[in-house]
Regions:
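A short hydrophobic/small-residue beta-strand
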Residues: 86, 151-152
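A short SAM/SAH-binding and catalytic strip from SAM-dependent methyltransferases
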Residues: 121-133
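Conserved N-terminal segment of class I S-adenosyl-L-methionine
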Residues: 1-114, 125, 237, 265-266, ...
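A short glycine-rich, Lys/Arg-flanked "PGG" loop and its adjoining helix->strand segment in the class I
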Residues: 135-147
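Substrate-binding/catalytic lobe of Class I Rossmann-like enzymes that use SAM or dcSAM, i.e.
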Residues: 185-237
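Conserved S-adenosyl-L-methionine
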Residues: 253-263
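Conserved class I S-adenosyl-L-methionine
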Residues: 152-192, 203-209
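Acceptor-substrate binding/catalytic loop of class I
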Residues: 159, 166-170, 227-242
Length: 282
């Protein structure tokens, strides 16, 4: 079902109902969820994770670093290697308890239980594509950053980057055209082809042509429709680097670096990913 809408076009009741569905999904994610997410996280290298390396290098001795939506906290050892003090926030207490065992010097809080503090560096690594209120999430990053501090966001670029994310499914149900035809679901297969070859390219062209600040949303991710989990199969927000940078600039931030300004980024990284590093006014 290819139906993407700007965030500001969503009805509050519709968004609230969807938030309940996605929250239930994250309370009991597929067993493969964090395994897939962590496959490339064991060792940051400039060739594979140039944005992660650049973000980690912003840490200084004694810096207080917060990752909002920390997952398994694979940023933590790189922060600590630079002399920083890592703090992570997420929803799952079981996940956080595992993090505490893995990284005993770090501090972990369940979302909503953290004290009202600010941090020198606030990081978001592949989280904003999973949130139902992207502007609200950016505001959280902003509010947790101290005056003069730095905010770093790394995520896919589903608008200016290549391809369409896997959370999109075509037709009336997830699955391949071949299986739809084999099972006699002809209308599903026909709609699949129409959306794949006509609707999706037109959306991509339109989304790239408009001004920043749209925050495209997908309230029908394939993971919630029963498809076996793939990376970004649960993506509900389609990030765009210029959306994020524009949001920061409108609040007076200085953009220190982006995926477009850093030099020597490998093509296989830049074609799918983006990065914004912004300095909050002092």
């Amino acid at each position: 079902m290819f139906r993407l809408r700007p965030f500001h076009c969503l009805e509050p009741a519709e968004l609230a109902a969807f938030e309940l569905r996605i929250a239930a999904y994250y309370k009991s994610p597929p067993e493969s969820y964090y395994f897939i997410a962590n496959q490339a996280a064991n060792q940051y290298t400039p060739e594979q994770q140039p944005f992660h390396c650049h973000l980690a290098s912003q840490t200084f001795e004694g810096a207080r670093v917060l990752e909002l939506g920390c997952g398994t906290a694979h940023l933590c050892p790189y922060v600590e290697a630079h002399g920083g003090i890592y703090h992570g926030i997420d929803y799952s207490e079981a996940l956080l308890e595992g993090n505490r065992r893995a990284f005993p010097r770090a501090v972990f809080w369940k979302m909503g239980s953290q004290p009202q503090e600010t941090f020198d560096l606030v990081a978001s690594l592949y989280t904003i594509e999973h949130v139902t209120d992207p502007p609200g999430y950016l505001q959280q990053l902003w509010d947790n950053c101290c005056p003069g501090g730095v905010i770093g966001v790394i995520c896919p670029d589903f608008v200016d980057g290549d391809g369409i994310p896997r959370s999109i499914y075509y037709g009336t149900s997830p699955g391949r055209i071949r299986s739809k035809l084999a099972s006699g679901r002809l209308w599903d297969a026909m709609l699949h082809l129409f959306e794949l070859f006509f609707i999706a390219p037109r959306w991509k062209s339109h989304a790239r042509s408009i001004s920043p600040g749209t925050f495209w949303m997908n309230l029908h991710p394939s993971d919630l429709a029963g498809q076996e989990h793939e990376i970004d199969g649960d993506a509900v927000h389609f990030p765009r680097m210029t959306d994020i940078a524009d949001w920061m600039k409108k609040r007076g931030a200085k953009i220190l670096a982006t995926s477009r300004t850093l030099q020597n980024i490998p093509p296989h990284v830049i074609k799918h990913n983006c990065y914004v590093l912004a300095k909050k006014p002092a």
